[in-house]
Amino acid sequence: MHFSPPLQKGTLLKRYKRFLADVTLEDGSVITMHCANTGAMTGCAEPGSTVWFSTSDNPKRKYAHSWELTQTQAGHWICVNTARANALVVEAILAGEIPQLRGYDALSTEVKYGHENSRIDILLKSDSQPHCFIEVKSVTLLDEIQGDKGQGYFPDAVTTRGQKHLRELAEVAKDGSRSILLFAVLHSGIEKVAPALHIDANYSQLLKAAQEAGVEVLCYKASLSKHEIRMVSEVKFAHQVTKN
């Protein structure tokens, strides 16, 4: 996924009201931009961090600029625009870069499904195998406090929406379709992923139950720069549970 036109650079002053951020440009002026991230953004939104943003030519947008990447003072790159994760995974699937998801004939996005009025991020279909339902989650929380280098967690805040998605995925698996939770690692410092029991215990418990019901968990890491984002490698998920 190439950024075109090229991203512009600034310095973060503050993020506020969840969806807004004030950024100082290189000429000293300050602009307000949209932040497409509903999470806590722990470690991703420290004042003084370098931010990279895109600009839309859509005149109907209230804020023309969108915060895309953070470059931390520790040198890490983070994609904070969670909308990029789904597009990145779709791109990787179509290019055959995720071996576990090869062999399907059709791909759809944002398809209604389930009993709780949900939409699945990606639906793969094939005449020769069951449908494959894929829910994509961005992983940007790096926590090395315990000395565990490269440890990433999801979620970074309590997520009732994420809990609902796990229930829906579990039901799909029980009905005989293939059901996948795919963690897209969008932080250059994260080398492995674990459920954030210390942040959302209910999510962790539901994830374990979903795996026992047959939900698969995949973790793929992206390479990040101001020029492009692309999936490059599979990383370890720390709590794989086998189906009952």
Curated annotation (Swiss-Prot):
Which CDD domains does UniProt cross-reference here?
Answer: SfsA-like_bacterial
State the Gene3D superfamilies in the record. Answer: 2.40.50.580, 3.40.1350.60
Q: Name one GO molecular function term.
A: DNA binding
The record's NCBIfam families line, in alphabetical order, gives: sfsA (TIGR00230)
| Family the entry assigns | Belongs to the SfsA family.
What protein name does the entry list? Answer: Sugar fermentation stimulation protein homolog
Upper lineage? Bacteria, Pseudomonadati, Pseudomonadota, Gammaproteobacteria, Vibrionales
Which gene codes for it?
Answer: sfsA
